[in-house]
Amino acid sequence: MHLNPSEISELIKSRIEGLEATAEVRTQGTVVSVTDGIVRIHGLSDVMQGEMLEFPGNTFGLALNLERDSVGAVVLGEYEHITEGDTVKCTGRILEVPVGEELIGRVVNALGQPIDGKGPITTKHSEPIEKIAPGVVWRQSVNQPVQTGLKAIDAMVPIGRGQRELIIGDRQTGKTAVAVDAIINQKGENMICIYVAIGQKASSISNVVRKLEEHGAMEYTIVVAATASESAAMQFIAPYSGCTMGEYFRDTGRDALIVYDDLTKQAWAYRQISLLLRRPPGREAYPGDVFYLHSRLLERAARVSAAYVEKETNGAVKGKTGSLTALPVIETQAGDVTAFVPTNVISITDGQIFLESDLFNAGIRPAINAGISVSRVGGAAQTKVIKKLGGGVRLALAQYRELAAFAQFASDLDEATRKQLERGKMVTELMKQPQYSTLSVSEMALTLFAVNKGYLDDVEVSRALAFESALRGFIRSKYGAILDKIETTKDLDAETEKELDAAIQDFKKNGTY
């Protein structure tokens, strides 16, 4: 057998050219210690802040502390199987979660994995959980309303699409109830809702999901759950995951509403992680960047311009603005709004709804304190008819609270003061509303119109809610066209006002309550 050297060299050349190098370049490190879900790693010289790290057993972690000779990472999920000496690899990726329509109607964990037993979720896209908020140039002013269906909120502290409105109060004052009612009321409003449950009992979350299903709200809602039994890391990242899911809808020219229930527990989880990472503690043992923790999350809620949507969708969606409205929840201790986290979030948001345990225990539910609850930008977005009729309500309540304090000491009151007190009592009574019974704009307008025009002046306060309910039923059955007109135009012209006047007078003559 004769071998030609040139043939051999050609053969070797072709083999070398056809060779596919399968070696992957990855930075590796070694686990030095594992304590309470915090892992110290030696090596990993090229790791990025917030990068995903791969541990043995298909477990992932986040690199949070980059020190001179070691890396502090937090494990996402179970960490019992990780031991000293294990190999850790860099992934070169920032933590991402799945986004898209496929998530609607599902319950997922902080990593976007389904936990409702309804099978896997296959989405076309995934996005990083940490994103920079849209700049000032890409934003638009808030001028479209978010109807919560609650009289006290829509009349006194209106919320607009793209606003951040804080719901703050002690435990057991109905904070979750207000947020869930707001979600239920978005039926048919073309609004995708995301409910992020942080550090709550699994049973409480399952109750909320059941209620949302009963009212048909899961058809447009995503639930992101990081229960109390999950690690602090999962509770810390859950709000960012939910926000990314909401941003997908905002950036495709749609409207989304996100509820963070609640951010106090996220701050606690972050404090726990920071202390375990040996970061220096500050006020109330929180780390120095706890303000940034919430500000970078809440700044992502915005109303964005059509140009921004066009840029984000590469020209696929034109002429549509998008919005992400945030309702963060904060729990206070004994009504103390001057604590560290409450003051931080109050200063970040565009207003707050303050719920008081005294009002709640007195049977005034939703227990909204009209005096210190404000909406800084929602007024421009308020529905015209509610704006016209609701102005007097806030004033009546504010004056009533003031006068009621004085009236305790005064024995004889003049007629005007007595009338004002009676009116305040009536308005307070009418602002009460049972849970899961949200009202449409026209139904709300009807109540406000009746109280403003003095149709309830001769009604006993204890019969006010019965009067309101009977009036609603009477008008809907006999004068339904008036309500439909208000619902369509979202305004009250002189002609409709006359018709409504006549209709209520008819009810007072012939109706029963």
Swiss-Prot record:
Swiss-Prot/TrEMBL catalytic activity: ATP + H2O + 4 H(+)(in) = ADP + phosphate + 5 H(+)(out)
Enzyme Commission number, as recorded: 7.1.2.2
One Pfam family it belongs to: ATP-synt_ab_C
Main enzyme class: translocase
SUPFAM superfamilies the record matches: C-terminal domain of alpha and beta subunits of F1 ATP synthase, N-terminal domain of alpha and beta subunits of F1 ATP synthase, P-loop containing nucleoside triphosphate hydrolases
Membrane topology: Peripheral membrane protein
Record keywords: ATP synthesis, ATP-binding, Cell inner membrane, Cell membrane, CF(1), Hydrogen ion transport, Ion transport, Membrane, Nucleotide-binding, Translocase, Transport
Subcellular location: Cell inner membrane
Origin superkingdom: Bacteria
Residues involved in ATP binding: 169-176
Residues annotated as site: Required for activity: 373
Principal subcellular localization: membrane
Record-linked NCBIfam families: atpA, PRK13343.1
Quaternary data: F-type ATPases have 2 components, CF(1) - the catalytic core - and CF(0) - the membrane proton channel. CF(1) has five subunits: alpha(3), beta(3), gamma(1), delta(1), epsilon(1). CF(0) has three main subunits: a(1), b(2) and c(9-12). The alpha and beta chains form an alternating ring which encloses part of the gamma chain. CF(1) is attached to CF(0) by a central stalk formed by the gamma and epsilon chains, while a peripheral stalk is formed by the delta and b chains.
Family membership: Belongs to the ATPase alpha/beta chains family.
Role according to the record: Produces ATP from ADP in the presence of a proton gradient across the membrane. The alpha chain is a regulatory subunit.
Name assigned to this protein: ATP synthase subunit alpha 1
Organism: Nitrosospira multiformis (strain ATCC 25196 / NCIMB 11849 / C 71)
Gene field: atpA1
